[in-house]
């Protein structure tokens, strides 16, 4: 009987830990997803200042990287619920070399690029950082001047 109880209890612990693994370590006002915690910050910062702010939160934090339509829809809903204005939002994608090769600050694969029509364009040779565009429901991206002041989306590893 004791062995049965121990096995049952162990299985329950494993089941609960797996069920809550996505939510286990994120602060209350952060969005848990795929082993990361995400938060949109309303403060308006340049892209570089936003990335530095995210990095200072704790090791493993950066401006967010998005890798699928599912990510885009989840973040669209989250940002729409959180932001009251119509501000575009910085994410962690940048063309550092100014050659249309876009890279994530977390060094993850650049495998999903839902650009707004006619973007990216490096307008006036000044747009090398990426924002999620508010009037597309936060579903499409635009390149903009890295000095523009925007709210931003951070991601941190659990």
From Swiss-Prot:
Signal peptide: 1-20
List of residues binding Ca(2+): 119, 121, 127, 142-143
GO cellular component, one term: extracellular region
Gene3D superfamilies membership: Mannose-Binding Protein A, subunit A (3.10.100.10)
PROSITE patterns, A to Z: C_TYPE_LECTIN_1, C_TYPE_LECTIN_2
Domain C-type lectin: 33-155
Pfam families, A to Z: Lectin_C (PF00059)
Residue ranges of the motif Galactose-binding: 119-121
Compartment annotation: Secreted
SMART domains from the UniProt entry: CLECT
Disulfide-bonded cysteines: 26-37, 54-154, 129-146
Keywords annotated in UniProt: Calcium, Disulfide bond, Hemagglutinin, Lectin, Metal-binding, Secreted, Signal
Tissue-by-tissue expression: Expressed by the venom gland.
Assembly description: Homodimer; disulfide-linked.
Family listed: Belongs to the true venom lectin family.
PANTHER family from the UniProt entry: MANNOSE, PHOSPHOLIPASE, LECTIN RECEPTOR RELATED
Free-text function comment from the UniProt entry: Galactose-binding lectin that binds to and agglutinates erythrocytes in a calcium-dependent manner.
Name used for this protein in its record: C-type lectin galactose-binding isoform
């Amino acid at each position: 009987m004791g062995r049965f109880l121990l096995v049952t209890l162990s299985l329950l612990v494993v089941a609960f830990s797996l069920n809550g693994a996505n939510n286990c370590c994120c602060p209350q006002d952060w969005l848990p997803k795929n082993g990361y915690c995400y938060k949109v910050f309303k403060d308006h910062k340049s892209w570089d200042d936003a990335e530095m702010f995210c990095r200072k939160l704790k090791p493993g934090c950066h401006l967010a990287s998005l890798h699928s339509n599912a990510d885009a829809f989840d973040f669209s809903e989250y940002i729409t619920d959180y932001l009251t204005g119509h501000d575009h939002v910085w994410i962690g994608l940048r063309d550092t070399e100014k050659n249309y090769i876009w890279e994530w600050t977390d060094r993850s694969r650049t495998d999903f690029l839902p650009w707004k029509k006619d973007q990216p364009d490096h307008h006036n040779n000044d747009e090398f950082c990426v924002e999620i565009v508010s009037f597309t429901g936060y579903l499409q991206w635009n390149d903009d001047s890295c000095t523009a002041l925007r709210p931003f989306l951070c991601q941190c590893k659990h």
